[in-house]
């Protein structure tokens, strides 16, 4: 368990006006401490999901200051003693000096003093010897004040429970503090003390909730000395800045300190109640360390034991609270879809995110007059229109496409117990799994043309493919748990011919265990193609939550990351060409995910050749395989991508195209070795259909090279055989009299059985360390070792294709395909093809890598 994923340690520093609270220590007379009373605040009417407390309601609540601001809470248990949480004072195993801390007593608002408020220095801080981390228990600390507190109406000690004290499950208790009102959402000025009612949960019920993976994919083993309080549905809880503060329960007219705020997984999250230190468990430790204090803390007897503990469900039979958002009867019928009607504009589509707020693109409204009286919001299954009273645009909405968001507050609340439902929003750490089922939904201006249901369905690409296909060059791929820069869908069906998606914006809804999340959005499409990259919603959850104070931010519901979750750690994306990404292939490739540029070229007569996708509408192949020698007939050709032998790749990426023309370079006399096949329509970039990069010179320096083809010509399962490139000098000598200009030689470093079959004319690929794959050559007819170089045809390819991905990898190639150096004497007169006896000599003469 990673302690940094817990959220107990306060990060908020609220600085009151300097000098607002001065230490006005007055030594009380001994008579004031006779028969110390506890747990009795002055009569009064009566955090996350909390509200302002009335002054004097919780007179034992103290504020612990460090560096001039509030850090943690605490409870006054005796005039000279405060009880708090150990994690407030221990950093990396080291206890912080007591003289750096001060205790503010009798305070209600951190912004200004009340009568009776005063400050005390801390003389000593004590923590249990066995404390190390919050999740391992013993999270409590005793603070001895440098001088006793002055007791009065706003400063009184709380009662401590004895070890035998029993708090019944379901008891309504109260937590107080100045902590965040939501995750990373600080309590606003004037920083008034907050109170929230929480119900005690039995150990079995709490362990049941924490045994199921939830936020951060973590579970928790409750230990003796821990206490849970909250609600399965969440929404009310303590949060950062409340640590060390009290959880008090009333018993027999007195308030007892049942728990000390310790930690939680997030704040107010579903099925994740707060975890407190059970004070009764540590009675003996407290008594031992305050022994001799006069007066010490009070441990009143429990007047009446609660009835026998209520029955708790067995852990395997417990019931979890279900999400209250993201429910749709069928995909495509979205109960949260909202149409914002502004006079003079087309409808703007958004989504209902709470009972009072709609989220929509800010670009719909930035040019409109803010006469909200004329604005209306239409919701499904609602005959009445909702009026708008307020618009809050994201602060970067006009400058940043990724922040094109606005929140519209409705005049009257929507009853969410009936239709419509609000959509769920992801937390910052939400990781939508690769392969997640998603769907496009309307977003922003425009009325999209009718689409078939299948055209809107998609699965998510993994982060590596998404960021490397559509992100910035060289950007690091965020690992799971970090907010992504992009979300990318892979569509289940190819686009209909002639379809154009440019007239409307789209949002991306993704489903987890039957619950729909608003995962991303895109206001404008790129050309006529379906949107390929969406701005993620994870980075905006805190802003939405802060504004709405009620949006449905929901925890991740599926956690089976599998190998995909490990692939993206510490990876960066290779460089792009001016036409985009090319030659991409993950460093660790799952079984079945192969070479996205490799194509099967099916020629009339059941002949199958190897082809390489070099641009969205072009495939490169060997001429001798495509065109029969002496034939003047142009064959009928189909091209297939995304095939792994007889089965398709995951996510259904099967692409087929027909060839409309064959282009050959103009060579004098000889038949050119390379042919370009023009496809009838472009291929959408995807992990199984992506152009390779072309290197216009020789072999890139420091490259590893492979012959890529099929070992079995029937099933055509791709296989890659490692090779070394011979220098032009060695190649010329070994093929004297038989070497065609523009060809080069390779030497296989693997055994014979690992080589590719050659009838389909396999390609030669090279890759520099961490870089993309580049195409260097295509096999020459009838040879395993001879290849026609791509470099000499670079100009022809560029002029013909227009979008070929030429990538200059830098440095000087260690060979050029042309060369006529004289042969060494010991190789002069070699046969026209390499002999086995010559291989050791060849290896010795190879230029080292």
From Swiss-Prot:
UniProt KW Transcription keyword? no
Q: Is Protein biosynthesis there in the keyword field?
A: no
Which residue positions are annotated as catalytic? Answer: 87 (charge relay system), 139 (charge relay system), 243 (charge relay system)
Q: Pinpoint the Peptidase S1 domain residues.
A: 47-291, 323-567, 584-802
GO biological process terms, semicolon-separated: proteolysis
Residues annotated as signal peptide: 1-19
Q: EC number(s) on record? A: 3.4.21.-
The cross-references to Pfam families, in alphabetical order and at most eight, read:
Trypsin
In the record, the note on similarity to other proteins reads: Belongs to the peptidase S1 family.
Name of this protein: Polyserase-2
Species in which this protein is naturally found: Mus musculus (Mouse)
Q: Which gene encodes it?
A: Prss36
């Amino acid at each position: 368990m990673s302690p940094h994923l817990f959220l107990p340690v306060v990060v908020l520093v609220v600085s009151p006006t300097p000098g607002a609270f001065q230490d006005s220590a007055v030594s009380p007379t001994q008579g004031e401490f006779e028969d110390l009373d506890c747990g009795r605040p002055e009569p009064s009417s009566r955090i996350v999901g909390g509200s302002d407390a009335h002054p004097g309601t919780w007179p034992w609540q103290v504020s612990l200051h460090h560096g001039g601001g509030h850090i943690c809470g605490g409870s006054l248990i005796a005039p000279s003693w405060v009880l708090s949480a150990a994690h407030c004072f221990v950093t990396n195993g080291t206890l912080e000096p007591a003289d750096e801390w001060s205790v503010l007593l009798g305070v209600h608002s951190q912004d200004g003093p009340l009568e009776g408020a005063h400050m005390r220095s801390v003389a000593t801080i004590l923590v249990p010897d066995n404390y190390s981390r919050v999740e391992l228990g013993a999270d409590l600390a005793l603070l001895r004040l440098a001088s006793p507190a002055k007791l009065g109406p706003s400063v009184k000690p709380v009662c401590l429970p004895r070890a035998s004290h029993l708090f019944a499950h379901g008891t309504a208790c109260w937590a107080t503090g100045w902590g965040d009102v939501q995750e990373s959402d600080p309590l606003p000025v004037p920083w008034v003390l907050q109170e929230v009612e929480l119900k005690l949960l039995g150990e079995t019920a709490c362990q049941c909730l924490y045994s199921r993976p939830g936020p951060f994919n973590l579970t928790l083993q409750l230990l003796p000395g821990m206490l849970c309080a909250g609600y399965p549905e969440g929404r009310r809880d303590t949060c950062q800045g409340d640590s060390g503060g009290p959880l008090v329960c009333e018993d027999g007219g007195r308030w007892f300190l049942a728990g000390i705020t310790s930690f939680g997984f997030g704040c107010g999250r579903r099925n994740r109640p707060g975890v407190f230190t059970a004070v009764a468990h540590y009675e003996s430790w407290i008594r031992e360390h305050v022994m001799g204090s006069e007066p010490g803390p009070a441990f009143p007897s429990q007047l009446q034991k609660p009835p026998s503990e209520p029955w708790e469900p067995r852990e395997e039979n417990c019931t979890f609270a279900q999400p209250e958002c993201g429910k749709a009867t069928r995909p495509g019928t979205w109960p949260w879809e909202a149409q914002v009607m502004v006079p003079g504009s087309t409808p703007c589509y958004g989504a209902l995110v709470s009972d009072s707020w709609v989220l929509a693109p800010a670009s719909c409204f930035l040019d409109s007059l803010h006469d909200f009286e004329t604005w209306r919001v239409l919701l499904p299954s609602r005959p009445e229109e909702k009026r708008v009273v307020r618009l809050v645009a994201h602060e970067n909405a006009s400058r940043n496409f990724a922040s094109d968001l606005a929140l519209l507050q409705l005049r009257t609340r929507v009853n969410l117990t009936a239709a419509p439902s609000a959509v769920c929003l992801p937390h910052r750490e939400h990781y939508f799994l690769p392969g997640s089922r998603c769907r496009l939904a309307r977003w922003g201006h425009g009325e999209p043309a009718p689409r078939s249901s299948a055209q809107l369905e998609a699965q998510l690409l993994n982060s590596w493919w998404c960021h490397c296909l559509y992100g910035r060059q060289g950007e690091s791929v965020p690992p799971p748990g970090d907010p992504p820069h992009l979300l990318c869908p892979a569509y289940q069906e190819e686009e209909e011919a002639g379809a154009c998606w440019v007239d409307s914006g789209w949002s991306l809804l993704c489903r987890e265990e039957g619950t729909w999340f608003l995962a991303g959005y895109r206001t404008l499409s790129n050309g006529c193609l379906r949107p390929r990259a969406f701005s993620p919603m994870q980075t905006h959850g805190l802003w939405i939550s802060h504004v709405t104070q009620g949006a449905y931010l929901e925890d991740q519901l599926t956690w089976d990351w599998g190998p995909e979750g490990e692939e993206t750690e510490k990876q960066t994306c290779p460089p792009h060409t001016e036409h985009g990404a090319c030659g991409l292939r993950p460093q660790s490739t799952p079984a079945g995910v192969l070479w996205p540029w490799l194509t099967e070229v099916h020629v009339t007569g059941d002949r199958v050749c190897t082809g390489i996708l070099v641009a969205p509408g072009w495939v490169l192949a060997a001429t001798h395989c495509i065109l029969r020698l002496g034939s003047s007939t142009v064959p009928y050709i189909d091209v297939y991508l995304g095939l792994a032998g007889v089965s398709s790749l995951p996510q259904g990426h099967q692409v087929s195209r027909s060839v409309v023309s064959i282009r050959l370079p103009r060579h004098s006399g000889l038949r050119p070795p390379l042919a370009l096949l023009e496809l009838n329509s472009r291929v959408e970039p995807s992990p199984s259909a992506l152009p390779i990069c072309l290197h216009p010179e020789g072999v890139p320096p420091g490259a590893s090279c492979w012959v890529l083809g099929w070992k079995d010509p029937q099933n055509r399962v791709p296989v890659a055989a490692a090779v070394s490139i011979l220098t032009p000098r060695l190649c010329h000598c070994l093929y004297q009299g038989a070497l065609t200009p523009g060809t080069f030689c390779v030497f296989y470093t693997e055994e014979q059985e690992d080589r590719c079959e050659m009838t389909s004319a396999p390609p030669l690929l090279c890759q520099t360390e961490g870089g993309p794959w580049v195409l260097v050559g295509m096999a020459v007819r009838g040879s395993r070792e001879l290849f026609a170089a791509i470099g000499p045809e670079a100009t022809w390819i560029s002029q013909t294709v227009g979008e070929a991905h030429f990538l200059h990898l830098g440095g000087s190639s260690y060979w050029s395909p042309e060369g006529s150096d004289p042969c060494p004497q010991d190789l002069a007169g070699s046969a026209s093809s390499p002999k086995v006896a010559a291989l050791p000599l060849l290896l010795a003469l190879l230029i080292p890598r």
